[in-house]
Every structure is written in structure tokens, then in C-alpha cells.
Regions:
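Short, Lys/Arg-enriched, Gly/Pro-containing loop segments at transmembrane-helix junctions
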Residues: 235-237
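Pore-lining and gate-forming transmembrane alpha-helices of multi-pass membrane transport proteins
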Residues: 168, 172, 207, 211-215, ...
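Short, aromatic-rich amphipathic segments at membrane interfaces
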Residues: 190-213
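Alpha-helical transmembrane segments
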Residues: 219-233
Length: 237
């Protein structure tokens, strides 16, 4: 992206023995490097029961996350099945690189995919999401996430109790805020609390109610009957 442009890379762990050379080249140009690993928690307080790869992490306070800070909600992210990243040494004074999501110090990882089997195993406070902005390339922006599963219905369905609602909305809101930041729109776009609204019809009396009930039942039956008659005529023609 030499002439500007923005990109989000969601790099879920992949056990295939291959290197993402093109993606790594893009990330390195923005001062970010990627680990070929899969992060997990050693402290049972930081993951759901029997799901050590579903990690409770911290959303860091940056200029990008200021809208989330203002909500007063805990700056906590839920990252399932994630790899980690780390800053790369790049000689570019116009480049700004920040961490977005960082694990607790009790996190560690295992080598997962890639061709560097002798690589040092990352552990401790690991970066699960980072972002960068390069003024020398028309303020081109890049965000990297160690997991794409955070946006799937399957992940939400796999959780129970308080785990299902406490951390996921803030993680998804972080994604929305990043998209808004890249599009130079309002970074206050985020999920609000769900509210149920019930529509109703006011019926003056029982006689009118019975009449409406007959209409509601008979009209669909009549339409279905007409459809069957037309179908039979076409079939026998």
C-alpha cells in the first residue's frame, strides 16, 4: 500500500507448515511482525471452563480506543483461538505503531503452523491485536487481529452464563471502532444494549377481534388453495 489505503488482517492460527510471506511483508512495512503460534491461558480465571484458548485480555487505552474508554465499561477483550504479534524494527519516523489487545502475564503459547519449528515460544504479556498508521503513505492504516473467530456465531453459542455476554460485545465494538477509524468516520459507532420492542394492535371489542381472527386464518388458506389449483391445472395441461 505504497500510495495509501487501509487494511485489516485477521490472522487466525493455522497449523499448516507454511509461511505467509506476502502478508508478513505487508505487516513488516508497518512495523509489525507475526508469530506462528496459538496463545492459551495458564490461569483458569482468565478463560472459560475447559477452554484455555479462549482468552480474557486487556484492551489498551490509546487514541483509537478513546471512545470505548468513555463508555465506562471494563476495557476487556475476549479473544478465542488467537496468534500473537510483536513490533518489528522499521526505520520510519512517520510510522506510528500501537498495541490494541494484550494478554495477562499468565498467558503463554505453543508453536502452531509455519516452518520455524525451532522458534522461541512467546509467553507473558502478548499482543493479540495491533494497529499502525504511516504518514509517509498518505496516512495509510493497518490493523492486525490474531483471531477471526471473535466475530462468529459459533463462538458465542459455545459460551454459557456470564461468559456469553460480558466480554464479547466490547471485543466486537473494538472492531467497529477500528473500521470507523479507517474510514475517517465517527469512532463512537458500537453495539448498544439489546432492547425488545413489542408491537400491538388495539381491538375495540370481542366481536371485532373474532372477525379479524377469521380473516387472518382464512386469507392464507384461500391463497394456498388458489396456488394449489393453479399448480394442478398447469400440471394436467
Amino acid at each position: 500500500m505504497l500510495n495509501g489505503g487501509n487494511m485489516i488482517l485477521m490472522m487466525s492460527p493455522n497449523e499448516a507448515k507454511l509461511d505467509y510471506l506476502n502478508f508478513e511483508k505487508i505487516m513488516h512495512g508497518y512495523g509489525i511482525s507475526m508469530d506462528y503460534n496459538k496463545v492459551f491461558e495458564t490461569d483458569e480465571n482468565n478463560h472459560p471452563p475447559d477452554q484455555k484458548y479462549f482468552i480474557i485480555s486487556d484492551i489498551l487505552e490509546t487514541e483509537l480506543t478513546s471512545a470505548l474508554v468513555e463508555t465506562g465499561s471494563p476495557m476487556i477483550a475476549f479473544m478465542p483461538d488467537s496468534r500473537s504479534f510483536y513490533p518489528a524494527l522499521v526505520n520510519n519516523e512517520k510510522l506510528k505503531v500501537e498495541s490494541l489487545i494484550k494478554t495477562k502475564s499468565t498467558a503463554t503459547s505453543e508453536i502452531f503452523g509455519g516452518t520455524h519449528l525451532d522458534a522461541k515460544i512467546p509467553q507473558g504479556n502478548l499482543d493479540l491485536a495491533m494497529y499502525a498508521e504511516d504518514e509517509s503513505r498518505k496516512n495509510s492504516k493497518l490493523m492486525v487481529l490474531g483471531s477471526a473467530d471473535m466475530l462468529t456465531d459459533e463462538i458465542l453459542a459455545s459460551l454459557t452464563g456470564d461468559w456469553q455476554t460480558s466480554e464479547m460485545p466490547m471485543t466486537i465494538n473494538l472492531f467497529f471502532v477500528t473500521v470507523s477509524w479507517m474510514d475517517l468516520t465517527d469512532t463512537n459507532i458500537m453495539l448498544s444494549n439489546k432492547m425488545t420492542q413489542v408491537d400491538y394492535i388495539s381491538i375495540p371489542n370481542k366481536k371485532t377481534g373474532d372477525f379479524l381472527l377469521v380473516i387472518m386464518i382464512s386469507v392464507p388458506i384461500l391463497i394456498s388453495a388458489v396456488g394449489v389449483i393453479v399448480w394442478l391445472r398447469r400440471r394436467n395441461s
